[in-house]
Amino acid sequence: MFSGFSSFGGGNGFVNMPQTFEEFFRCYPIAMMNDRIRKDDANFGGKIFLPPSALSKLSMLNIRYPMLFKLTANETGRVTHGGVLEFIAEEGRVYLPQWMMETLGIQPGSLLQISSTDVPLGQFVKLEPQSVDFLDISDPKAVLENVLRNFSTLTVDDVIEISYNGKTFKIKILEVKPESSSKSICVIETDLVTDFAPPVGYVEPDYKALKAQQDKEKKNSFGKGQVLDPSVLGQGSMSTRIDYAGIANSSRNKLSKFVGQGQNISGKAPKAEPKQDIKDMKITFDGEPAKLDLPEGQLFFGFPMVLPKEDEESAAGSKSSEQNFQGQGISLRKSNKRKTKSDHDSSKSKAPKSPEVIEID
């Protein structure tokens, strides 16, 4: 009679096929849990607390890991998804993160339908921060990689909450891939590509107008005790701005007593003398120093100076004085070499000297 079912399980009867878990619970926020079992960090995740009896039913129904659930609020018709953190809630109750209560639009004590489900592994998610304060995070992708470990699923249009440096940030799920009828993905043990939309309230600045305003402020700040950038005014180095060549040339002409213009007998105009380069100009300090008129807000730190070279004699003397440990070595052992003629005493030296002649007046 039941031979048509012999194909299940290889002809040995029925097998334990996964079945659907579906129950109704009274939902409450995590803040209303008993102090002994409450975990405030669970508010910044996507997992719920179920009673121990739910674990027994899930085991009997052969629900596969990871255990994912579809949460439906019949009062509002809203749906979201999540995982389970622990089975420590009171019988008939389920505890949800605060953001999940707001997403479903339900109040504490509302009736919530919870059923097991399967969603595809996530590959891509696009997020929209709900505040410009999110831009203060230096490395948002690294932060999300850490906080998303507290989530099992991400559902489109959900506004999740994360905590970073003592601040709470709200993030809306705009898009997920792969797409499915549940509009949700599983983020457990998967590589997830993350993209960000501009935060709510963020306005892209006009960089061209901002740069023009900064240049205008720099030009207007000239002469007001503020730092001046010569490149803004189109000026070059300090020597160019103070006309160092003209000042040095005028000072040199004052030292010349016979300054004038020569005339040729032939009537031809005299050849103009080539301009002398500033580097080749010889600077003397005998005359009166030239007046240095500087614009307001500029400083002058002196003319270029080349130190004189040391004389060769002084250099040689310094080198000789630097040579230390000069002397002659002496051997303590007598030499066995034969004496040369120069080593022997001459016979003249041994001969008696003649008496000196003394003259007596």
From Swiss-Prot:
The record marks 37, 39, 109 as: Monoubiquitin-binding. GO terms for cellular component: cytosol; Doa10p ubiquitin ligase complex; Hrd1p ubiquitin ligase ERAD-L complex; nucleus; replisome; RQC complex; VCP-NPL4-UFD1 AAA ATPase complex. InterPro entries: Ufd1-like (IPR004854), Ufd1-like_Nn (IPR042299), UFD1_N1 (IPR055417), UFD1_N2 (IPR055418). It holds the Pfam family UFD1_N2. The modification Phosphoserine is found at residue 354. Residues 317-329 have a biased composition (Polar residues). One of its GO terms (molecular function) is polyubiquitin modification-dependent protein binding. The keyword Repeat does not apply. Transmembrane segments: none annotated. One of its GO terms (biological process) is protein localization to vacuole. It comes from the Eukaryota. Disulfide bonds: none annotated. Keywords: Phosphoprotein, Ubl conjugation pathway. Coiled coil: none annotated. Component of the heterotrimeric CDC48-NPL4-UFD1 ATPase complex. The CDC48-NPL4-UFD1 ATPase complex interacts with the HRD1 ubiquitin ligase complex composed of the E3 ligase HRD1, its cofactors HRD3, USA1 and DER1, substrate recruiting factor YOS9 and CDC48-binding protein UBX2. Interaction between the complexes is mediated by interaction between CDC48-NPL4-UFD1 complex member CDC48 and HRD1 complex member UBX2. Forms a complex composed of CDC48, NPL4, UFD1, DOA1, SHP1 and deubiquitinase OTU1. Interacts with NPL4, CDC48 and UBX2. Functions at a post-ubiquitation step in the ubiquitin fusion degradation (UFD) pathway. Has a role in the endoplasmic reticulum-associated degradation (ERAD) pathway. Required for the proteasome-dependent processing/activation of MGA2 and SPT23 transcription factors leading to the subsequent expression of OLE1. Has an additional role in the turnover of OLE1 where it targets ubiquitinated OLE1 and other proteins to the ERAD. Belongs to the UFD1 family. Present with 3530 molecules/cell in log phase SD medium. This is Ubiquitin fusion degradation protein 1. The gene is UFD1.
